[in-house]
């Protein structure tokens, strides 16, 4: 018998939450159902939704496997909350993605680690990639998460303390549609590891207003042509094409980004598109 920890995204908006439950069975993980009325994915009168396994990982926090799933309706049709199915139809395995996920660690009452007595007395600046108990909070969680992801077979390529106290980042490399699966499972493991330390994870774009950096997920991308014969002309053309759909893109990148994309704190204003070489104000 094998323990399979099924993971999926619920129907909450504007951002979905991660959900999970465990199945013990022989053989490979089968399709499984759940109560969609409890996850905003179905009405109570017809609440069955179907979990379709799409990727498996070693479970570093328990025996068995982690099973990333996409959601279908009870009639085996793509659920409206399932954006993976549409992505799978167009994403190529020769597309590489490098995700840089920033986050804050918080206490059960919502206060950020290191902020228990109010705003830190020193401004941001000394906390980035820092050492020392006065400059870093939560390193043990970041390192445990890194180990968990590597044990699961997820290609994390690094981690570091970020600009604000209690803020961290990790980098996740993936190829094709599996890159998205790896990212979601890495986030799931981050939440589970944080549970063990009695803290929570906050990926809101701007947990603290004022002169403090927010959190984003910078996304690096390349296809085969970019990696083998990329030129300045090619990259400029791609950036111009991205600029032409800037508003559409912003509408898909999650809520409250207007709080982070202000033109300050290593960001560009949300209503402007720009690009440059090694230019962090373009984020």
Language model segments and positions:
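Glycine-rich, acidic/polar active-site loops that bind/position phosphate-bearing ligands
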Residues: 1-283
